Amino acid sequence: VNPKVVEMTNRGIIHIVEPGLQELCSKVMEFGKLKASDVPEESDVYLIVVPTPFKGNHEPDISYVEAATRMVAPFLKKGDLFVIESTSPVGTTEKMANLLYALRPELEGKIYIAYCPERVLPGNVIYELMQNDRVIGGINSESTEKAIQFYRHFVRGTLHRTNARTAEM
C-alpha cells in the first residue's frame, strides 16, 4: 500500500488519469462515503482488487491476492462477503477460501466467497464498471447470490450467475 496515495485520496486528489474519477471521488468524499487507509477496516463486504503480474515462467503471481486475503482475514465476521476481482487463474478463489478457513476455521460456511472479474479498459473504467455485464461465481450458490445482491446496487449490466471456477476462466 502506497501511503502517499492514501494521503492524496483522503484529500480528494486522484493520482491517476481516469475520466470522471476525480469528480466522483470529490463527490463521495464530500458526503463522507470514502476513506482511504493503509490497513483494512471492519466492513460487510471486502473486495480484493490487486495486481496479478506474471512470474518469470509466465505463471500468474497470485501473491498479492494472497497478501490481501491475509490482511482482511482478521476483520471477517459471520455473514460478510469476500470477493476477488483481480484477474486470477482457475482455482484461486477456492485457494483463498481454504486460506481463510485455515486462518479463521470458525468462519467456514459462515461467510460468502465469490469471484467477479474486473474487465475494463483504461480511460473508460467508471462507465464500464457500472454498465458492463458481469460474471459472478461463488464457491457455492449462496455466495453467488450474496455477491449478485451486492453488485446489483451499482451494476446496470446483466449479472451472469455461475460458479467461481467458471468465472475465473
Regions found by a protein language model. Give the residues of each.
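Short glycine-/small-residue-rich Rossmann-like dinucleotide-binding loops
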Residues: 50-52, 87, 140
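Conserved N-terminal Rossmann-fold NAD(P) cofactor-binding segment
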Residues: 2-45, 51-60, 102-105
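Rossmann-like NAD(P)(H) cofactor-binding subdomain of soluble oxidoreductases
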Residues: 54-119
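Internal alpha-helical scaffold of NAD(P)-dependent oxidoreductase catalytic cores
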Residues: 98-116, 120, 125-169
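Alpha-helix C-terminal capping/helix-to-coil transition sites in glycosyltransferase folds
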Residues: 41-42, 78, 131
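Redox-cofactor binding/interface segments in oxidoreductases and associated redox assembly factors
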Residues: 46-48, 84, 137
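Short, surface-exposed alpha-helical segments at coil->helix boundaries
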Residues: 3, 22, 93-94, 144-148
